[in-house]
Amino acid sequence: MFRRLILAAPLLVLVACGPADKPGAAKPVASPPAPAVVTRQAADGTVDRFTPYVGGPLMLDEFSVGPLMAQTEFSLEAIKPRFPKAKVDGAFSRIIVDQGDGILEIQSNPGTTRVGDIRITGGTPKGPRGEALRMRWADADLDYPRCWIGKDRDAHAVICTQPGEPVLRYVFSVPGWTQDTLPSEAILRERAILRGFIWRGGAPTQ
């Protein structure tokens, strides 16, 4: 009997200790908490509710640029809290959101107190189908008939839209192209690279 107890003792110790942690085993990292929804009163007395952008991909679609929507008031008071980590400055008809690695140029919507056109360059914007800066035109699943040559600051660039989505525009640079006419589809497939987005506020027209 005594001998059986001696043999059983080490087994009891092992059971009590349980399985040992493997050295160097990585422990799961907790995800950062999601930004809290912010509620403020707009200048016209309406309730302005949004989730601030604090990092990661800036999601774009027909209805919004991150926390900016067509109903967003065009004012520093409305835009600054939407981008708490960015430098936000401007006046009159344009507000600049400088995120360090990317810029949002926000125009006022003429005749209203709301945001209008928004130009997105740099940073980590992402379109509704995963479109990202530096993407090739050939990989963006765009239709050639929905593209046109840019003007003014977009001269020699090519601007495209997706079917039924006139608000979000894709701006492509075409290295070596200096003409004021639309390059052929073959040239776009070979050279065109996504350099930015334009989100048209108000009633978009080409």
Spell out what each predicted region is.
Residues 157, 165-173:
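Internal interaction segment
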Residues 171-185:
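Surface-exposed, gly/pro-biased binding rims or lids
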Residues 18-154, 161-164, 181-206:
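Short helix/turn-capping signatures at newly exposed starts of structured segments
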Residues 1-7:
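Bacterial N-terminal signal peptides that target proteins for export
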Residues 13-16:
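C-terminal motif of bacterial Sec signal peptides marking the signal peptidase cleavage site
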Residues 10-11, 153:
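Residue-level signal for mature regions of secreted extracellular proteins and peptides
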